[in-house]
């Protein structure tokens, strides 16, 4: 699908007298209802906006590259905000915000960008990683950061499922019922499983997926379906049939949020 078909805004003007600050940040999502501000629940967005008000006295709306669900983590989330304040150097926001944020949220870097940059709409690729571990090797330090299974399905079979995901597809099967996207079509560039050693002992099964955008619960639904099919040793074609069905009732059980990380956001030019 051509980038012109993504149906995204193309202009992001700054109000007079404002400047735009870009943040690269990470967070442990265990204690949050997700990225987006909620009426009654704790969110990452709200914590950053509160810290900004304490710092510069402005009520600022922070725009993230995308939403993460409750208990989903981020290693490379990107956000931006527009402010009137001209005194604080852009690079100083990272240090100053970290002094005011809860320990679960850290700003890695901050920089000033032009009105050509938008954290959500100028991104070209998002990467998620999902981690799975066998019960036998699960430790207290894995809590909240991996999905547990009795045993790993054959990785060759999992990768045969994952190969069906690459390309431009309608992912209705793997979208949450609450997803309100106008189109369920997404471009997926990379989709594969691999093993890596856990620092706490044992092996981690890691699923990596890269795409232009993702539907609500899409990654977790795809992972849950592939793990379920792999456990039953279903042929690769079965996953393909479920994808093509465009029927969310054909998806398997959605994998838990604990093992999911927003790993990286790529841009043509972050400035």
Can you say where each PLM-predicted feature lies in the sequence?
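Structured-RNA-binding interfaces characteristic of tRNA pseudouridine synthases
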Residues: 2-271
């Amino acid at each position: 699908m051509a980038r012109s078909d993504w149906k995204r805004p193309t202009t992001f003007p700054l109000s007079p007298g404002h400047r735009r600050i870009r943040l690269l940040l990470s967070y442990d999502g265990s204690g949050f209802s997700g990225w987006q501000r909620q009426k009654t629940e704790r969110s990452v967005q709200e914590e950053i906006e509160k810290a900004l008000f304490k710092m510069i006295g402005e009520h600022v709306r922070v725009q993230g590259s995308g939403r993460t669900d409750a208990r989903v983590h981020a290693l490379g989330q990107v956000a931006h905000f527009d402010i009137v304040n001209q005194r604080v150097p852009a690079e100083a926001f990272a240090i100053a915000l970290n002094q005011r944020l809860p320990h679960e949220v850290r700003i890695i870097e901050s920089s000033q960008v032009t009105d050509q940059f938008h954290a959500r709409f100028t991104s070209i690729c998002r990467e998620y990683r999902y981690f799975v571990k066998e019960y036998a090797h699960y430790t207290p330090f894995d809590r909240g950061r991996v999905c547990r299974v009795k045993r790993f399905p054959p990785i060759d079979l999992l990768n045969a499922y994952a190969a069906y995901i690459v390309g431009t597809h309608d992912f209705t099967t793997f979208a949450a019922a609450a997803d309100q996207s106008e189109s369920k079509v997404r471009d997926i560039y990379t989709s594969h499983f691999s093993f890596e050693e856990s620092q706490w002992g044992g092996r981690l099964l890691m699923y990596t997926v890269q795409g232009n955008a993702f539907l609500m619960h899409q990654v977790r639904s795809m992972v849950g379906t592939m793990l379920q099919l792999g456990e039953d040793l279903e042929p690769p074609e079965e996953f393909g049939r479920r994808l093509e069905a465009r029927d969310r009732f054909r998806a398997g059980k959605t994998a838990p949020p604990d093992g999911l990380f927003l790993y990286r956001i790529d841009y043509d030019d972050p400035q």
